[in-house]
Amino acid sequence: MHYFEDVVLGEEIEIGRHTPSRDEIVEFARKWDPQPFHLDEEAARDSVMGGLCASSCHTYAISALINSRRSTRLKTAAMLGMEVRFPHPVRPDVELTLIELPLEKRVSKSRPGVGVVRSRTRLQSEGGPDVMWMETSFLVERRP
């Protein structure tokens, strides 16, 4: 486990990778976001998306899955908030890489046992653009 003191600002960390299949995208959409461009390749081609793509909810879930597999975890006490963007669609069978960049940190004024960390996390498609980015602030335990 890593603590607040272990967070290195400005050091980009590759957290992990995942490749969503066509079946995975359709299965998720069928249950959680049944839009034609997530379910049917022909309908997707004729849509504003220009082809089958993962739901934004699925894209975020992929980032959470990759993050859950990371080898070094922070002692996170709470999520304080986030801003999320989905600038490009996630396509089937394209590898995605989750990358985190800690931007700032400070000791909490009201709770000296924790610190506040703000980071930018992006999900990058193989050989292409970011398909999601988010800035998050969370409480991280300080070393005992």
Model-predicted segments: where are they?
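Hot-dog-fold acyl-thioester-processing enzymes
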Residues: 1-81, 143
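HotDog/MaoC-like acyl-thioester-processing domains
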Residues: 1-9, 86, 90-144
